[in-house]
């Protein structure tokens, strides 16, 4: 039987091309599926344990007596306690309990959680399978920085009232960064690099040794290490170690180009000392500690004030200072209604906001203070001292209940760990080391 000529005919060029295109399409689809699958497997988001809340955190009410500077509270009534499982290295912990939207934001080894100030219950949490490196809050967001493949450079922004995810940023960072923040910006820094962000984690400034930078000459001191940094409003102050010589660099916090710092003054501080660090910053001033002396500089480089701590009533400096090597020297600073303060194991020092001129000193302070109406609460050895906010006179001392003292007993031999206070409404938060106790201020 004769076969049709078409049966033995070779495939046409068009048929061959179509077959090849189909094979290529299948291979491409498989490759895309594999890439998506690997991205999902390797994604940090897949390794997140998180909850959110829609419930209102409520509002904090303050007793009218808080505005009477001579009114003395009767007692501190314990209401709840909680623990932080995070490391308490002196350069990574906050100078005060982090309170935002009527919630306490608590650091954990691998995450954060929000605690209701009303009853101490958890409102939301965010946890990952990598260690938490730094925690701060600013511009209405919680910023949690985790360790990633390139050091402690993976930062997530969360809404403090709900735990809602806002943004993520990845950077190259060391394994031991410190948080730096103001009411305008937040960021992290280590001995080599500093960056500031907006609330959406868009970077507004980078400073220091920029990894693989195509324009290294934009940085004023890429060869220098960073000792400490503070920021307020539109000022960023950085103390550098340049081959054993200290330099104070005062610059714009949000320059026109984030890669190019706008330096306003670059001040020679002399030889680097073991205690060299920023201790306070104003809108256009910065105070630097070195060799047991504090010098205050204006943004134009003028020195305004010099104070020898040995001539004050503050306690002598500890024999061992900044023993953690290249770790950032983040000071314990807090703001009061009429002053800025700095605490160290020497005691508490207060500065005038406009000039940073030293204005008061309390050697008996065991940590950072907090305002309550027309009062200031200050931790002391036998409890919490209550001050008239205008005169700064101590009008009385509130003893801490025994339960709170036993909670803090494990940290009694660590004077470098301050007792840190925060007040919201009529709730006083007392934190030392890993413990946080909440008390109702009873009048």
Residue ranges and their predicted role:
Residues 213, 218-219, 225-231, 251, ...:
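C-terminal, beta-strand-rich globular interaction domains
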Residues 2-3, 16-25, 38-103, 110-111, ...:
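Aromatic (tryptophan-biased) beta-strands that constitute blades/sheets of beta-rich domains
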Residues 2, 21, 25, 29-64, ...:
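Repeat-blade elements of multi-bladed beta-propeller folds
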Residues 216-218, 311-313, 319:
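Surface-exposed beta-loop interaction hotspot
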Residues 155-159, 247-256:
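Beta-propeller blade signature
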Residues 164-195, 202-226:
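Asp-box/WD-like beta-propeller blade repeats and closely related beta-sheet repeat scaffolds
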Residues 1-16, 31:
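Intrinsically disordered, low-complexity acidic/proline-rich regions
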Residues 117, 160, 199, 253-255, ...:
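Inter-blade boundary loops/turns of WD-repeat beta-propellers
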């Amino acid at each position: 039987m004769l076969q049709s000529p078409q049966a033995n005919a070779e495939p046409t060029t068009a048929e061959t091309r179509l077959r090849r295109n189909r094979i290529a399409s299948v291979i491409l689809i498989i490759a895309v599926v594999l890439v998506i699958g690997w991205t999902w497997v390797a994604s940090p988001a897949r390794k997140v344990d998180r909850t959110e809340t829609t419930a209102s955190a409520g509002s904090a009410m303050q007793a009218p007596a808080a505005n009477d500077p001579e009114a003395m509270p009767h007692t501190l009534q314990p209401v709840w306690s909680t623990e932080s499982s995070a490391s308490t290295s002196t350069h990574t912990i906050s100078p005060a309990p982090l309170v935002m939207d009527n919630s306490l934001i608590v650091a954990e080894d691998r995450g954060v959680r929000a605690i209701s100030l009303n009853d101490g219950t958890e409102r939301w949490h965010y946890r990952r399978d990598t260690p938490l490196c730094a925690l701060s809050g600013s511009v209405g967001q919680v910023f949690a920085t985790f360790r990633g493949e390139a050091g402690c450079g993976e930062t997530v922004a969360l809404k403090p009232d709900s735990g809602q995810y806002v943004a993520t940023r990845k950077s190259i960072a060391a394994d031991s960064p410190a948080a730096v923040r103001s009411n305008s910006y937040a960021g992290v820094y280590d001995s080599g690099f500093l960056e500031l962000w907006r609330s959406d984690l868009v970077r507004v400034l980078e400073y220091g040794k920029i990894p693989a930078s195509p324009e290294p000459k934009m940085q004023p001191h890429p060869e220098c290490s960073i000792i400490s940094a503070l920021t307020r409003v539109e000022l960023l102050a950085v103390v550098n170690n340049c081959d054993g010589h200290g330099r104070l660099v005062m610059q714009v916090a949000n320059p026109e180009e984030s890669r190019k710092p706008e330096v306003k003054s670059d001040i020679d501080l002399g030889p680097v000392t073991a205690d060299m660090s920023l201790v306070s910053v104003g809108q256009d001033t910065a105070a630097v500690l070195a060799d047991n002396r504090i010098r205050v500089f204006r943004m134009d480089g003028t020195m305004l004030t010099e104070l020898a701590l040995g001539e004050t009533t503050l306690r002598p400096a500890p024999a061992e200072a900044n023993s953690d090597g290249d770790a950032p020297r983040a000071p314990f600073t807090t703001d009061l209604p009429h002053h800025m303060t700095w605490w160290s194991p020497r005691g508490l020092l207060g500065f005038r906001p406009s000039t940073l001129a030293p204005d008061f000193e309390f050697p008996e302070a065991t940590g950072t203070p907090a305002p309550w109406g027309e009062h200031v609460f200050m931790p002391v050895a036998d409890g919490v001292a209550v001050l008239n906010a205008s005169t700064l006179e101590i009008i009385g001392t509130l003893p801490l209940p025994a339960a709170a003292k036993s909670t803090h007993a494990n940290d009694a031999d660590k004077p470098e760990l301050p007792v840190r206070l925060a007040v919201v409404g009529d709730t006083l938060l007392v934190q030392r080391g890993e413990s946080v106790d909440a008390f109702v201020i009873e009048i």
